[in-house]
Amino acid sequence: MSTKPSSEETPDLQGAFPRLSDAQIAALDAQGQRRPIQPGDVLFAEGDRESDFFVILAGKVASVDGKGTPEERVIAVHGRGRFLGELSLLTGEGAWYSAVAVDAGEVLAVPVGRLRELVARDPAFGDLILRAYLLRRSILIGLGAGLRIVGSKYSPDTRRVRDFAARNRLPYRWLDLEADSSAEAVAAQFGVTPQDTPVVIVHGRLLRNPSNAELAAAIGLPAPSEPQASCDMLVVGSGPAGL
């Protein structure tokens, strides 16, 4: 993990960064558009909800968490034959990091709708992409990328927000007001009082004690369903029908 893009490609040790075959790239090439890239070009930015599926044909591209902030860091660097993105590309969530060109090259941009059509015709190709995206999401969760949740471990609302993130496999970092020294710095940066907590920082936006529905909308997830009312039923009588 570094704070500035390197030209060295990140090794694929877990299967999260597979390289597509020439045949797979050719199939995608028929459905997409080639684009030249220059160092510093942003292919998609954190928070973007509409992005193409990018395959690197030449050059290298870095996945950058927190681009433009003091906490900016490089998650991975990809070279020829690798594809970009993670699970959010398929779920409609805002992107959890930015993709930034490290050096000059060329990428293939395929609309997500066309990608879905290819996946439907080639299940093995779909399995490759889905497995890689699931592993990438796990990496983000392990790194504490994505959301920042600031709140007390004694707060029921803090537990609710953290449970929501965990249920939806969202990458997040929890800053405990009682134990994490950086929580105070974040609170001061955004002018947050203890009464405002828990707060959630998502794609640069501050949410004060958001409901699950508000948090879902900010992320790009469908609104969570309301809990169904339940009641007891009493059956009175006897006999085979129980009536």
Predicted regions and their residues:
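Cytosolic regulatory regions built on CNB/CRP/Popeye-like sensor folds
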Residues: 1-151, 155-163
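Gly/lys/ser-thr-rich phosphate-binding loops in alpha/beta enzymes
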Residues: 84, 175, 238-243
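Rhodanese-like catalytic fold shared by cysteine-dependent sulfurtransferases
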Residues: 128, 139, 184-185, 218
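Short domain-boundary/entry signatures in modular proteins, especially
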Residues: 140-146, 222-230
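Short, thiol/selenol-centered motifs that function as redox-active sites or metal-ligating centers
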Residues: 148-187
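Structural micro-motif
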Residues: 189-201
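Non-catalytic, surface beta->alpha helical segment in thiol-disulfide oxidoreductase systems
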Residues: 203-224
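Beta1/beta-strand and adjacent pyrophosphate-binding region of the FAD-binding site
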Residues: 227-241
